[in-house]
Amino acid sequence: MATTFLRSSGGVMDSSKVIGLKVENPKGESLGKVESLMVDLAEGRILYAVLSFGGFLGMGDKLFPVPLSSFSFRADKEGCLERCILNVEKDTLKNAPGYERDHLPATADRTFASKVYTHYGAAPYWED
């Protein structure tokens, strides 16, 4: 089956198509799935995607925010999204800024988000 890679900046997509997508690195190793998208209401932009990784059957997994610009999206020949590709090793993800499911970071404070963007080498949109 032919696949197409789409950059996150290359168009518009329904957020419900992104949530639940499997995430893997270019080696094909599973990095979890997209749990949610955090929205910056003041700016009207997506702050980051939240990845769940490391648990078993949803138990004990840690949540990792990742800037959308760090993903590529893989679509099948019909254009349906199949997976997100994140160009990191598993250890890089394990050492990324993250949090437990019940301990959401203070999203109004950009200090945490800045650490996330720096970890992935992404330019924060609020510094444009």
Where are these regions (language model features)?
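Peripheral interaction segments used for macromolecular assembly
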Residues: M1-D128
